[in-house]
């Protein structure tokens, strides 16, 4: 077994694979059990699947919590039981000729911000100890509580394509969203807001944790690279797992405190801070000075020393102005 590997892989998940299938395959390729993924993709969905290897698996919770970017396609005119193109048709509402692109764009804009979303029946959300898809496969529909999600942007990226014979409208979209967002449900809710049934007909994740679709690598290629002894050339550093968190660069004194898990008071800090990159793109982030950590708007921050991730800190749940280590990595 190879237990010395450590880092993040940008895997291109192909259609037909579950996220767990990818993890299982990689365990065989890399000869290690310490592997996990940073956010489930449905089998039919393709694109970026961040994979943590070795000690980086300790950061999976931050990878899963990170925002994601997707590009896909909405079809308005009929809905399916699974809310995507794989399910059986359950409702047909032929689209009238007077539906305009401006109406669609206006409707999409109303989904931007913090919204409530009811998870679909065909999902892994648990209710009373059972996953929703287990109820759905048994022919049951049960009440699901709405969950708050954040949609940073939701825009149409193509002209609408009319199929007047079948009364269908199709168009492409791009969405940047928070953890827990069901994009297929977003497509269904968009169509419903326009007065029609609809579903998500295609989807690809294009960015996550600073990893981009253009750099994603298929499993077959990863296997080739591993066999050639060049795996280190495609392993990203652990810091990619915390790309959504503000970055605080520690002084030597603060590093000595962090490495032994000491708490910090906001008033003790004067540090260089980098803001998390909102486009989920690995670029040099803007730097500025903080006189104290109260200016941070997040509940956590990533602590770096000599350009290496050393810890993740969080606001103390009970003590105002105190930050405690959530995870120490050195």
Swiss-Prot record:
According to its UniProt record, the EC number is: 5.4.99.25
Tell me the SUPFAM superfamilies matching this sequence.
Answer: Pseudouridine synthase
Any one Gene Ontology BP term: tRNA pseudouridine synthesis
Task: State what this protein does.
Answer: Responsible for synthesis of pseudouridine from uracil-55 in the psi GC loop of transfer RNAs.
**Keywords of the record:** Isomerase, tRNA processing
Q: Which GO terms describe its molecular function?
A: RNA binding; tRNA pseudouridine(55) synthase activity
The answer on whether this UniProt entry bears the keyword Isomerase reads yes
Name assigned to this protein: tRNA pseudouridine synthase B
Enzyme class (EC, first level)? isomerase
Q: Which family does it belong to?
A: Belongs to the pseudouridine synthase TruB family. Type 1 subfamily.
List the NCBIfam families: TruB
Give the source species. Lactococcus lactis subsp. cremoris (strain MG1363)
Reactions performed catalytically: uridine(55) in tRNA = pseudouridine(55) in tRNA
């Amino acid at each position: 077994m190879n237990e010395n590997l450590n880092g993040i892989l940008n895997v291109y998940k192909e259609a037909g694979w579950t996220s767990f299938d990818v993890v299982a395959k990689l365990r065989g390729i890399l000869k290690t059990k310490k592997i996990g993924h940073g956010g489930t993709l449905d089998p039919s969905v393709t694109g970026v699947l961040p994979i943590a290897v070795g000690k980086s698996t300790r950061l999976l919770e931050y990878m899963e919590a990170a925002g994601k970017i997707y590009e896909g396609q909405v079809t308005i005119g009929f809905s399916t039981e699974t809310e995507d193109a794989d399910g059986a048709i359950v409702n047909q509402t032929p689209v009238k000729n007077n539906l305009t692109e401006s109406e669609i764009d206006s409707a999409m804009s109303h989904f931007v911000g913090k919204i409530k979303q009811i998870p679909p029946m065909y999902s892994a959300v648990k209710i009373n100890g059972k996953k929703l898809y287990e109820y759905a496969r048994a022919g049951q529909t049960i009440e699901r509580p709405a969950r708050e999600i954040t949609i940073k942007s939701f825009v149409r990226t193509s002209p609408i394509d009319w199929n007047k014979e079948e009364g269908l409208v199709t168009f492409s979209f791009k969405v940047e969203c928070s953890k827990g967002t069901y994009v297929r449900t977003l497509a269904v809710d968009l169509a419903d807001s326009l007065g029609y049934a609809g579903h998500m007909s295609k989807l690809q994740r294009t960015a996550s944790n600073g990893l981009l679709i253009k750099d994603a690598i298929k499993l077959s290629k990863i296997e080739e690279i591993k066999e050639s002894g060049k795996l280190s050339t495609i392993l990203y550093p652990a810091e990619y797992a915390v790309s959504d968190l503000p970055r605080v660069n520690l002084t030597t004194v603060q590093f000595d405190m962090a490495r032994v898990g000491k708490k910090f008071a906001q008033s003790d800090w004067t540090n260089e801070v980098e803001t998390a990159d909102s486009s989920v793109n690995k670029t040099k982030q803007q730097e500025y000075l903080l006189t104290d950590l109260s200016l941070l708007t997040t509940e956590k921050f990533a602590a770096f020393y000599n350009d290496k991730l050393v810890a993740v800190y969080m606001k103390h749940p009970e003590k105002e102005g105190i930050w405690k280590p959530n995870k120490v990595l050195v």
